[in-house]
Amino acid sequence: MKLSFKCLPVGNLPYENNELATKLTIKLFDNIPFLADLPNADDEDNLLNRTLEGVPGFKLKHKRVIVEDSNRHKLKLTQMDAIFNNPDIDKLEEFKFHTFFLDRYLQIIKRIKPRETVVNLLGPLTIAQLIENKEASQILADKFYRKLFIQTVTIRALWIIHRIKEVSPDTLPIIILEEPLLGRFGDLKRENEELTRDIIVNMYAKITQKIKEFHGAVGIQCFEKCDWKIPIDAGVDLISFDAYTNPNNINIIAEHVNNFLMGGGRINWAIVPVMTEARVKELTIDKLYDRFIKTVEALVLAGVSEYYAYNRASVSIQGNTDKLPLIFAEKAIILAKQLSRKIPTIKAHPTPDSNQ
């Protein structure tokens, strides 16, 4: 499935109510609405709760994650196994989640019936590293817990895909797995020799395969330096990286990236910085465009086809905007949208003998 969006909606929004979030979504992301978190409206509105709250085997308290091993939970996990293998719509409803913006989001989908939409969930590698009563390297090497992470994320994804398809059957749901701790995989591997790269690739592949079977697409988002070969080898449709702070993160695997793009994959360049008010204040569209072109050209010089580098590109802000003053949060998001409209379209398709 070929993704078509040029501006990827990213991060928490700064609003304290649904009305303002709805207004921005319809104005800037009518072709790809997203299920935003609004922590300024509800401090429990976050990806951790969205992904894990109410799931058997996990206990959440003040943003802490505890894994529970009781027999009662293991019985529930057996039920999850059955649902994962045969995703019955009624059974999926047992694992629904709620967010502050969810009802309004589904109303938007029903009303405008967009081509694509985005829902973010926490990815399994990050979930494992947030658990307090188990070592991450040990828990990821344990087949039982990997299965728990895979099924938790997948079942949550399948439920929201079903809800989207209910109101707009032709909309493509893109499930983006947020993996801020993907860059720590090397450290985890050194801590436990049983934890191999193939284990992590296989974990992502199982989630990706099941979501695609349910007519969704899958992306991985990480704004730290990491090994992007892992999600690419797992068969994801999108990788989203910090192109502002780590612009060369994918240049070192240019051949891998080129094959990914040729196969229909897409790269999101999170190149609009939102770290500080001062940084946003000095931004202009000309500065951003110049930086974007130079960053993409560096990838082309590394060996990636210019045709695919530009034609399979989208842009976004670099993270959450809920801590910024409203005027600067909106400025960053608007600039990302403006930049997306300036992404060059390369018309000359590369020949088999040239990567240009």
Identify the residue ranges that each predicted region occupies:
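Alpha/beta catalytic barrel-like cores
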Residues: M1-D142, D233, G265, L299-A302, ...
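An acidic- and aromatic-residue-enriched active-site/binding cleft used to recognize and process polar
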Residues: L13, P39-A41, L122-P124, P180, ...
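Catalytic-face loop-and-helix region of soluble metabolic enzyme cores
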Residues: D237-H349
